[in-house]
Amino acid sequence: VPGFSGKHYNSLDPKGRLIIPAPFREILSSNHSSKLIITNEVFDRCLCAYPVDEWQKLTDKVSRMPQTSDAVKYFTRRVIGSAVECEIDRQGRVLVSAALRTDAGLNSDVVLIGLCNRIEIWDRSEYDGVADPTKVDKDAYKEEFKSLGL
């Protein structure tokens, strides 16, 4: 099953609707459904959009974890607790809730990043800051990539 990949620049309309890029919609219609679960990313100030089946895998995994763990509680509250099921309309748009737009600091200009099983949705200026290759510890990353076999 092909996954999501690529970077797409887009904008939110005044009502908070976002056009899902055509390549992402094609993957969804071929392999998943016309719905996305949109939620907060656990640490970064962005949103994650999951196909329903991928979301189910994630929630099944979390439900098997120790619910007394502070990390699991945080993850559950931050990610699962803020999730909204969104239908992709005939124009290829989803309505991003006001609460999620606020949590992620989304203004009108956004970037959608395909990350295999999910899509990240960033405010353009926020993404430009975190994606700056001059701001990462390349040597440490090279070592970690090597240990991971990348």
Model-derived segments and their meaning:
Residues 113-139:
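C-terminal end-helix/capping segment
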Residues 2-42:
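A positional/architectural concept
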Residues 16-20, 92-96, 100, 119-121:
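Short, structured motif recognition centered on aromatic/hydrophobic residues
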Residues 134-150:
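Acidic/histidine-enriched, glycine/proline-rich intrinsically disordered or flexible terminal extensions
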